[in-house]
């Protein structure tokens, strides 16, 4: 997947120098990376940054239900990292639980999880399940509204705990 992205960027950029801005503008964003950015912004207490990333995703071609699924996956991974931290387990254990061979990914998750309290992540997992089903159960809100409401409530939980 990387080679076609590099070729696309090189094909659109005039000259021989590719800037960070060129990559941001032209490269396909990976939903997992966007979800990680949103949760990282919440961990940093940068709620405006998390909301801006969500607005960017919703303005693009991302489906709200897909966004919610990826955020849910990310929050569950952060929860696993927090449990590993609380139980004194190391990176190798976290890699095994997450099913990844990337030590870097496990470390990044552990670093972000350390910024959250266990109650905030526990509530985050519960909220993910609640908001993934909310539009279908009640019909009172749209998928996009559910994702926005989830992000607000998760940020409030993180701030409170």
Q: Where on the chain are the PLM-derived regions?
A:
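Small-residue-rich helix-loop
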Residues: 15-121, 158-159
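Non-catalytic interfacial helical region
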Residues: 1-37, 133-138, 142, 153-161
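Generic structural concept
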Residues: 68, 72-75, 125, 129, ...
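Hydrophobic packing residues in well-ordered alpha-helices of helical domains and bundles
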Residues: 2, 68, 121, 144-147
């Amino acid at each position: 997947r990387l080679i076609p992205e590099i070729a696309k960027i090189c094909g659109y950029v005039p000259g021989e120098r590719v800037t960070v801005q060129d990559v941001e503008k032209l490269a396909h964003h990976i939903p997992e990376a966007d979800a990680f950015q949103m949760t990282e912004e919440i961990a940093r207490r940068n709620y405006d940054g998390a909301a801006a990333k969500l607005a960017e995703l919703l303005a693009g071609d991302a489906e709200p239900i897909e966004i919610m699924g990826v955020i849910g996956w990310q929050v569950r991974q952060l929860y696993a990292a927090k449990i590993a931290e609380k139980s004194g387990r190391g990176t190798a254990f976290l890699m095994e639980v997450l099913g990844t061979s990337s030590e870097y990914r496990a470390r990044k998750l552990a670093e972000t999880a350390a910024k959250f309290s266990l109650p905030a992540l526990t509530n985050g997992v519960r909220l993910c399940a609640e908001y993934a089903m909310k539009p279908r159960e009640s019909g009172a809100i749209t998928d996009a509204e559910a994702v926005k409401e989830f992000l607000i409530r998760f940020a409030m939980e993180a701030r409170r705990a």
